[in-house]
């Protein structure tokens, strides 16, 4: 014989389900990141008698869209999605932070429980079907943004081909024609110096074109597919030394001095070495391009915090106006002072993509007439 449902028991069950703290723990592939999972689970187990808690562990390489959705800047990170408002905890002491905030979250959950049914239903947040719908809407928005970026990128490439690539090609062509006219003349000392200068100019222009083509190809690859990131422990002092050595001839040619402030005890970073090499090369290329003969360039590396290492490339060039300092990272944005040069091109836009995929930051400090300093951060390998 079937017994009638116990409405009181059902109500209690529904009440318990609604009064549940929901947490998302974001971790990366580093062993040190996974070490936080069990201590957090152990603490939640000890306090779950007071209130049920739902903990979901998310591998950031499997769901990168959620990392961007919650605007995370470091891992591991613990995100409280219910009760509202959303809150993010990050750092090396997640368990202590959780102990501090748990009583406040319980209090907030109890207050929300006594609100209207409509308000409570809105606080269900990111569970079940609503979570899936939210993710789907977010993905569709990202797809739309990616398509718009690709269309914009095509316009940028056309603009680059029309101006940036044509300018060095014209200069190299003029130099070659001048050499051809001078080849049948008697080689005087003055003509020999001129010939050497023309060869040097031609070589520099070909170098500019090669860099532009490399930027276009790499940027095109990153626009049409996700950057392939293979993160390992990278030692920046060794990497920076390798990069600087390849600039010796160019620095001598422009009478530039490159100062390195790179402590050898800087901890390793968690990064893709080739992508970070590309960022540093791009920043040094720009510094050399905008620094006049006899100027100075500084490459420095600083262990900024226990979790971050900062790399800086500074020059004594003309500087960048404050209102333009953010826009130079927006693809093919051209400063007024770039009209006589090949411009920043797509390089800085690509640098920002690379640093963001490493959960770092990139920015510029500059005063017109006093040079520029480009900085970026990377997570310490643990």
From Swiss-Prot:
Any Gene Ontology biological process: circadian rhythm
Top-level taxon of origin: Bacteria
Keyword ATP-binding: yes
EC number of the protein: 2.7.13.3
Positions carrying Phosphohistidine: 163
Record's catalysed reaction(s): ATP + protein L-histidine = ADP + protein N-phospho-L-histidine
Keywords: ATP-binding, Biological rhythms, Kinase, Nucleotide-binding, Phosphoprotein, Transferase, Two-component regulatory system
Residue ranges of domain Histidine kinase in the record: 160-382
Leading EC class: transferase
Quaternary state and interactors: Homooligomerizes. Interacts with KaiC. Participates in the KaiABC clock complex, whose core is composed of a KaiC homohexamer, 6 KaiB and up to 6 KaiA dimers. SasA and KaiB(fs) compete to bind to KaiC.
Domain comment quoted from the record: The N-terminus interacts with KaiC, while the C-terminal histidine kinase domain autophosphorylates and is probably responsible for self-oligomerization. The N-terminal domain stimulates the C-terminus to autophosphorylate.
Matches recorded under PANTHER family: SENSOR HISTIDINE KINASE RCSC (PTHR43711:SF26), TWO-COMPONENT HISTIDINE KINASE (PTHR43711)
Name this protein carries in UniProt: Adaptive-response sensory kinase SasA
Lineage of source species: Bacteria, Bacillati, Cyanobacteriota, Cyanophyceae, Oscillatoriophycideae
